[in-house]
Amino acid sequence: MPPLSESEFLALAGKELDRIEAAVEAAADAADADIEISRTGNVMELEFENGSKIIINSQAPMQELWVAARSGGFHFRRDGERWVDTRSGDELYAALSAYVSQQAEAALKLG
């Protein structure tokens, strides 16, 4: 699949960040977890009751979504309709479910 233009990628990444935000809100509500979500442009910050954070941002030059969590830094690249970790091959929402659950100290399922 050919690379997207920067504007195409930013539009796609923006829609994905919208989906992530909605998924985190729904999962937090379902688990009665307190997660503060803030977003500025292509950067989303999730802040948990224990003070820990997860940062998710789009990297247009690399055409990736980057996730910084307590457990490490992860890069996700689009593969068809999915975003997959460039090292482990994990799908974005499965991976985010694990990171968010760890930091919220509650079982949350995104996606």
Curated annotation (Swiss-Prot):
InterPro entries: CyaY, Frataxin/CyaY, Frataxin/CyaY_sf, Frataxin_CS. One of its GO terms (biological process) is iron-sulfur cluster assembly. Coiled coil: none annotated. GO terms for cellular component: cytosol. One of its GO terms (molecular function) is ferrous iron binding. It comes from the Bacteria. The keyword Isomerase does not apply. Keywords: Iron, Metal-binding. Belongs to the frataxin family. NCBIfam families: FeS_CyaY. HAMAP family: CyaY. Involved in iron-sulfur (Fe-S) cluster assembly. May act as a regulator of Fe-S biogenesis. This is Iron-sulfur cluster assembly protein CyaY. The lineage of its organism: Bacteria, Pseudomonadati, Pseudomonadota, Betaproteobacteria, Burkholderiales.
